[in-house]
Amino acid sequence: MEFSKKTRELSIKKMQERTLDLLIIGGGITGAGVALQAAASGLETGLIEMQDFAEGTSSRSTKLVHGGLRYLKQFDVEVVSDTVSERAVVQQIAPHIPKSDPMLLPVYDEDGATFSLFRLKVAMDLYDLLAGVSNTPAANKVLSKDQVLERQPNLKKEGLVGGGVYLDFRNNDARLVIENIKRANQDGALIANHVKAEGFLFDESGKITGVVARDLLTDQVFEIKARLVINTTGPWSDKVRNLSNKGTQFSQMRPTKGVHLVVDSSKIKVSQPVYFDTGLGDGRMVFVLPRENKTYFGTTDTDYTGDLEHPKVTQEDVDYLLGIVNNRFPESNITIDDIESSWAGLRPLIAGNSASDYNGGNNGTISDESFDNLIATVESYLSKEKTREDVESAVSKLESSTSEKHLDPSAVSRGSSLDRDDNGLLTLAGGKITDYRKMAEGAMERVVDILKAEFDRSFKLINSKTYPVSGGELNPANVDSEIEAFAQLGVSRGLDSKEAHYLANLYGSNAPKVFALAHSLEQAPGLSLADTLSLHYAMRNELTLSPVDFLLRRTNHMLFMRDSLDSIVEPILDEMGRFYDWTEEEKATYRADVEAALANNDLAELKN
């Protein structure tokens, strides 16, 4: 379905003419999830995003649908249970996006180690029980030191005592956002990026009835009326709540910055994702992950009070990560000059909430009695003297300072909150990308209750656990063969096998629409056929307005294909210029945007 600059203009026009049931401010993963469920449930839905979709936090994650094994150090079972359950749901509704990728976790005998081999085994067995993969080929394995080094011979040998392998999944975070957005558009939502909420509309009683918005492309200011407005702006949540300039000024959010660095795979060759302690005794862990022909690693976790739109990688961030990675991979000797790309993102943590990210933070402790009982039960389970039900009973009796009962009752998912201010504004904040659907579901339950009670508007919510995103109309049990069939269709349209498979995996059930463009398009000068098709599909069906949108978020060219990027920037500018009829001045502006984004990702300031 068309989702383009033209439909954007039409959506802005319609938003001015109607009273919406729900207006969503924020087009990251949280807002995208709410938009999909609202539109599919029949609500008159609008969404505005001041940047591009996923430009903030939601395209700057570690790019995993991570199960949170680390939380089991404190046997924080609720968060892991929720996370692996939601991960399974994402596999159902977006089966072309998460890809299984077993994680290697080496264990070192050192101060501050997260796991001993025994604790790791207990944690992995619990993890498998929660994920439902016990006694399957995906079940965990405990490895000896030699077995770890056989898998990853370039790891540091000193202090290594063994390790484990457990099931995890890689993710394309920005694609997950756009596929939710596209499905909402398909179901009738009115959606526009580069539109900023600058204030609220109020009735005589002080209740919010809409927003004053600015189209950042035309500078047009207009009003959008809505029965309910929900704020899903992540790190910007406080700023949006404070737009009313009435009463309390909110300071709920405590953003932290996470940095990832990308190098060529020749600098660190990893055959699978690796997850290990920093070795600094700071209680944190770091990922090293293969992607395309690159290796990336992260993340940092530092409090952040700077520019929310443009968080930057600092020398301190680089030194921290390079020190850790060079220690664990002593033959790598990576320097800042080896870094090909990078990104810095902000986690929308809620101040005072016990849930940090899955790489760090103190998630509390459990009592010695609870721990000893659990260990004894798990040992008996492993020797077949106890049942899974016995383990689950022991888990349920854990006395944890981070138990769900200690969370704010407004939480709709671990680490998230749903609040309604006196003026009627709803704010859905916090959480993790894996939990986005559950967060949206909790918010939508509240939304339909309010619409019924206060506006006599009745809606029946969809079952969002089975409702596919755009591109997700695949049989989850047969994804590989369906993707293969799409790839062969691409080959029949003139693509080589590698390109066809790349696009089939990227677009899922939308791949035939991408390949069909080959009938009407000529290959753009300087671009491959695959890039030509992908670019035109992005402009026509993914509301892609700039080269940076395409290179950084609709695809991963800017992050993981740095070698070939310089050669396609000008051809992309030319092709987008032809499509959008840009003037030379407009093209120069977009060229400058690309150069600025590349300089930022390449760490040009730090290297000079």
UniProtKB/Swiss-Prot annotation:
Matches recorded under Gene3D superfamilies: Alpha-glycerophosphate oxidase, cap domain, D-Amino Acid Oxidase, subunit A, domain 2, FAD/NAD(P)-binding domain
EC number: 1.1.3.21
Cofactor: FAD
Positions annotated to bind FAD: 21-49
GO molecular function: glycerol-3-phosphate dehydrogenase (quinone) activity; glycerol-3-phosphate oxidase activity
Region (Disordered): 393-418
Catalytic reactions of this protein: sn-glycerol 3-phosphate + O2 = dihydroxyacetone phosphate + H2O2
Cellular location(s): Cell membrane
Keyword annotations of the record: Cell membrane, FAD, Flavoprotein, Glycerol metabolism, Membrane, Oxidoreductase
NCBIfam families in the record: glycerol3P_ox_1
PANTHER family named in the record: ANAEROBIC GLYCEROL-3-PHOSPHATE DEHYDROGENASE SUBUNIT A (PTHR11985:SF35), GLYCEROL-3-PHOSPHATE DEHYDROGENASE (PTHR11985)
Protein name according to UniProt: Alpha-glycerophosphate oxidase
Encoding gene per record: glpO
